[in-house]
From Swiss-Prot:
CDD domains: S1_EF-P_repeat_1, S1_EF-P_repeat_2. PROSITE patterns: EFP. The keyword Protein biosynthesis applies. This is Elongation factor P. Keywords: Cytoplasm, Elongation factor, Protein biosynthesis. Pfam families: EFP (PF01132), EFP_N (PF08207), Elong-fact-P_C (PF09285). The keyword Iron-sulfur does not apply. Transmembrane segments: none annotated. Belongs to the elongation factor P family. Gene3D superfamilies: 2.30.30.30, Nucleic acid-binding proteins. The gene is efp. GO terms for molecular function: translation elongation factor activity. Pathway: Protein biosynthesis; polypeptide chain elongation.
Length: 185
């Protein structure tokens, strides 16, 4: 058990029969009444976000989450195959389980698979990934003064806004948390 006063971003807890990750939290001490903790939690099974308020000092169960380093091998229909890098066991995840992460996954990429006992909860991507631009409009000379951007399609199908100097075939560093352009690789 862990006190809600010890909440921190990224902590995984069990509440109301679900497994939740703390996305955001705030300790509130009103002038009148008891203190409480307002939190934003993400359900690791469904991906849904819920706001929940706890009384200060309330105890919740800490979920025993394990992460395994695995390599993304290939897609087989709507199943995606990952291999454990230490035991070489293969794991298949459905497209619905990793829908949001698919636009960043490349073959042979190392990722963290989040496990709760024998249940697979999802995929944790690295903070940034390198993707190649397969389609974008050519940059026009002199466009850099406005500081604007144009859409570019990457090899995984992700559409990202990039500066005008980016061309087809360039490798880009993309932030996986929000899908934004970071730099050229």
């Amino acid at each position: 058990m862990i006190s809600v006063n010890d909440f921190r971003t990224g902590l995984t807890i069990e509440v109301d029969g679900g497994i939740w990750r703390v996305v955001d939290f705030q300790h509130v001490k009103p002038g009148k009444g008891a203190a409480f903790v307002r939190s934003k939690l993400r359900n690791l099974r469904t991906g849904a976000i819920q706001e929940k308020t706890f009384r200060a000092g309330e105890k919740v169960a800490k979920a025993q989450i394990e992460t395994k380093t695995m390599q993304y091998l290939y897609a087989n229909g709507d199943q995606h195959v990952f291999m454990d890098t230490s035991s070489y066991e293969q794991l298949e995840l459905s497209e619905t389980q990793i829908k949001d992460e698919l636009k960043y996954l490349l073959e042979n990429m190392s990722v963290q698979i989040v496990m709760y006992g024998a249940e697979t909860l999802g995929v944790e991507l690295p903070n940034t990934v390198e993707l190649e631009v397969v389609e974008t409009e050519p940059g026009i000379k002199g466009d850099t003064t406005s500081g604007g951007s144009k859409p570019a399609k990457t090899e995984t199908g992700l559409i990202v806004n990039v500066p005008f100097f980016v061309n087809q075939g360039d490798k880009l560093v993309i932030n996986t948390s929000d899908g934004s352009y970071v730099s050229r690789a």
